[in-house]
């Protein structure tokens, strides 16, 4: 009885503190937006710093990266400026979007008008596949009505979204969505390779699809893949099997990254494989989703029982803005430091849902321009991300599918400073030891010059060749200071076989640009599908 009283008092106190906290954040976000719009005019307002880590290739690799380019496309008249380092398997994307394009985009941002016409530089007659698309700008042809339901938009493209509920082994019911053509009139579709998309922190899988015909989800479907969109536990609508939880309501929020890797990822993958009849699938993940993927691959020997090993279920693992090591922003931002100091106290954040006020506001306001605008300015204030590279007419749509329910315990896993807790911020090197080999192969088919035989191994036993591990494809934004992508690059180029991975390092992208940039199809979508590995030709 006493514990229940204390719990209710903590909930009340934390509600008061968090309401004040969010009010202060809201005011600061509005003020920053006002100052930026009216007093700080910049052609390129982005934070162009990278993390503090420098990329350090193995000393034995002497060749300088070779420069090459790809032509302009339907989404941009700026040819891609690429620098290829074959020894380290890295493509350096040095492309800089023209100032004229960014200036016209910035003016739209300042006006806050998500429906304004963008001043176009694109000449579709110059694009190599201009005849394939009748629109000079696909984004301008999109429906700008704000509806928090992907099915509304995708019906316009001739795609149905099937919704499934998948139950995890520990009793959580998670949502899984599936693209299915509405135009085949009952004719069986050609068998497609399954691809599962997994979202980042405080997002749903709608983030992969909210840009409509300019989204990665749509592009993958149109490219011939069987697209599944996975959500983690609780998500937009929290659901549980209380019988499996022993009717213990405290267990509803007693979970963190470990349970998401052990149960959510396993349940989603098994459901897709059982539904499609394939033995393996490709996993495309963003941010937190990449943390789940890498944890399951690197530490699967410890996390999974013998009936499931993630490393044996994936043909490809595509990591967008991978969150493996913490970036400098976690220490630089006062708001994040303050949150980290209080995250372990139930008097500040409670013990259940993380800042439930966010979901209350979403329930009341989602589908309005003001909700999407406030979501954007808060992201902008907290992380210095902006919409310079996004299609402005789609910006409001992109915020329709966040935030989502997460647990306080999950945020403790991300931010806790306590020495007795293993957190991403303080213990990433223990979860992902960067001086050990994660994917060891007995037959070294690495031609990069690395002497991997002398490296210490982590948990995965040696396999005969790189084909027995998933093919790992990473797109790392240089301007992403939330995570340390450069440290992850250093790990792979110095401690993993060249044949296991492929990296793109994109100079002008930030954390969310890998999903929503106007040219994301050219800079991520196309190279992704060109490098996916399949045992049998499709």
From Swiss-Prot:
Q: Which cysteines share a disulfide bond?
A: none
Keyword Phosphoprotein attributed = yes
Give EC number(s), comma-separated: 3.1.1.13
GO terms for cellular component: cell periphery; membrane; plasma membrane
For this protein, the parts annotated as crossing the membrane are 12-32
Please give, as recorded in its UniProt entry, the membrane topology of this protein.
Answer: Single-pass type II membrane protein
The residue ranges flagged as biased composition, category Basic residues, are: 60-70
What catalytic reaction does the record list? a sterol ester + H2O = a sterol + a fatty acid + H(+)
Residues with the Phosphoserine modification: 73, 107
UniProt topological domain (Cytoplasmic) ranges: 1-11
Could you say which enzyme class this protein belongs to? hydrolase
> What does the entry give for GO biological process?
cell wall mannoprotein biosynthetic process; lipid catabolic process; sterol metabolic process
Pfam families, sorted? Abhydro_lipase
Keyword set, alphabetical order? Cell membrane, Hydrolase, Lipid degradation, Lipid metabolism, Membrane, Phosphoprotein, Signal-anchor, Transmembrane, Transmembrane helix
GO terms, molecular function: sterol ester esterase activity
- Check the record and name the InterPro entries matching this protein: AB_hydrolase_fold (IPR029058), AB_hydrolase_lipase (IPR006693)
Lumenal domain ranges by topology: 33-538
Tell me the active site.
287 (nucleophile), 480 (charge relay system), 511 (charge relay system)
User: Where can this protein be found?
Assistant: Cell membrane
Chain spans, region Disordered: 42-87
Job of this protein: Mediates the hydrolysis of steryl esters. Required for mobilization of steryl ester, thereby playing a central role in lipid metabolism.
Miscellaneous note, as given in the UniProt record, is: Present with 1630 molecules/cell in log phase SD medium.
- Annotated family: Belongs to the AB hydrolase superfamily.
This chain belongs to which protein, by name?
Sterol esterase 2
Q: Which organism is it from?
A: Saccharomyces cerevisiae (strain ATCC 204508 / S288c)
Q: Which gene encodes it?
A: YEH2
């Amino acid at each position: 009885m006493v514990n229940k009283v204390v719990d209710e008092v903590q909930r009340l106190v934390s509600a008061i503190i968090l309401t004040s906290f969010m009010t202060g954040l809201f005011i600061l976000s509005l003020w920053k937006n006002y100052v930026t719009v009216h007093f700080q005019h910049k052609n390129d307002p982005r934070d162009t710093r990278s993390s503090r880590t420098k990329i350090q290739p193995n000393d034995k690799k002497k060749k300088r990266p070779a420069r090459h380019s790809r032509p302009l496309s339907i989404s941009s008249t700026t040819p891609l400026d690429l620098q290829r380092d074959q020894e380290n398997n890295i493509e350096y994307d040095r492309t800089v979007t023209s100032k004229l394009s960014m200036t016209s985009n910035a003016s739209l941002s300042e006006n806050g008008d998500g429906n304004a016409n963008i001043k176009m530089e694109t000449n579709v007659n110059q694009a190599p596949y201009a005849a394939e698309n009748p629109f000079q700008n696909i984004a301008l042809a999109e429906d700008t009505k704000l509806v928090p339901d992907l099915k509304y938009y995708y019906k316009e493209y001739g795609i149905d979204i099937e919704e499934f509920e998948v139950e995890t082994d520990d009793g959580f019911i998670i949502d899984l969505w599936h693209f299915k053509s509405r135009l085949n009139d009952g004719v069986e579709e050609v068998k497609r390779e399954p691809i599962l998309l997994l979202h980042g922190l405080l997002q749903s899988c709608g983030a992969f699809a909210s840009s409509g015909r300019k989204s990665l989800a749509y592009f993958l479907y149109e490219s011939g893949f069987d697209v599944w969109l996975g959500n983690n536990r609780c998500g937009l609508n929290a659901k549980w099997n209380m019988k499996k939880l022993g009717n213990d309501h405290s267990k509803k929020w007693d979970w963190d990254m470990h349970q998401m890797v052990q149960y959510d990822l396993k349940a989603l993958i098994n459901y897709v494989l059982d539904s499609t009849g394939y033995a393996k699938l490709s996993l495309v993940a963003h941010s937190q989703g990449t943390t789940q993927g890498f944890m399951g691959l690197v530490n699967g020997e410890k996390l999974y029982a013998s009936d499931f090993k993630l490393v044996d279920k994936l043909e490809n693992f595509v990591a967008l803005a991978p969150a493996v090591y913490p970036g400098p922003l976690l220490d630089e931002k006062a708001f994040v430091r303050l949150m980290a100091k209080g995250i372990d106290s139930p008097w500040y954040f409670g013990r259940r849902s993380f800042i439930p006020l966010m979901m209350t506001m979403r329930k009341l306001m989602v589908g309005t321009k003001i909700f999407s605008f406030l979501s954007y300015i808060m992201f902008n204030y907290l992380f210095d991300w902006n919409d310079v590279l996004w299609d402005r007419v789609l910006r409001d749509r992109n915020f329709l599918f966040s935030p989502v329910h997460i647990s306080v315990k999950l945020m403790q896993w991300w931010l806790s400073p306590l020495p007795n807790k293993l957190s991403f911020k303080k213990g990433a090197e223990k979860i992902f030891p960067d001086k050990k080999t994660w994917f060891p192969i007995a037959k070294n088919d690495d031609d990069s010059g690395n002497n991997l035989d002398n490296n210490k191994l982590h948990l995965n036993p040696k396999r005969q060749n790189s084909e027995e591990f998933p093919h790992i494809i990473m797109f790392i934004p240089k301007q992403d200071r939330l995570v340390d992508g450069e440290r992850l690059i250093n790990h792979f180029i110095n401690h993993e076989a060249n044949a296991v991975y492929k990296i793109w390092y994109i100079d002008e992208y930030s954390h969310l640009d890998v999903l929503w940039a106007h040219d994301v199809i050219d800079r991520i979508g196309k190279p992704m599908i060109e490098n996916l590995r399949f045992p049998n030709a499709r």
